[in-house]
Amino acid sequence: VRPYLVAFYESH
């Protein structure tokens, strides 16, 4: 999993 995708998913 990409870090930026994780950040986006977690931030949502």
UniProtKB/Swiss-Prot annotation:
Temperature dependence: Optimum temperature is 50-70 degrees Celsius.
Origin: domain of life: Eukaryota
GO biological process, one term: negative regulation of mitotic nuclear division
Regulation: Activated by Mg(2+) and Zn(2+) ions at low concentrations. Inhibited by Ca(2+), Cu(2+), Fe(2+), Mg(2+), Mn(2+) and Zn(2+) at higher concentrations.
Enzyme class: hydrolase
EC number of this enzyme: 3.1.-.-
Record key words, sorted: Hydrolase
The keyword Hydrolase appears for this protein: yes
pH dependence: Optimum pH is 8. Active from pH 3 to 9.
MF terms (GO), sorted A to Z: RNA nuclease activity
Protein purpose: Has ribonuclease activity towards yeast tRNA, polyadenine, polycytosine and polyguanine, but lacks ribonuclease activity against polyuracil. Has antiproliferative activity towards L1210 tumor cell line with an IC(50) of 41 uM. Lacks mitogenic activity towards murine splenocytes and does not inhibit HIV-1 reverse transcriptase.
Protein name per the record: Ribonuclease
Source species of the chain: Pleurotus ostreatus (Oyster mushroom)
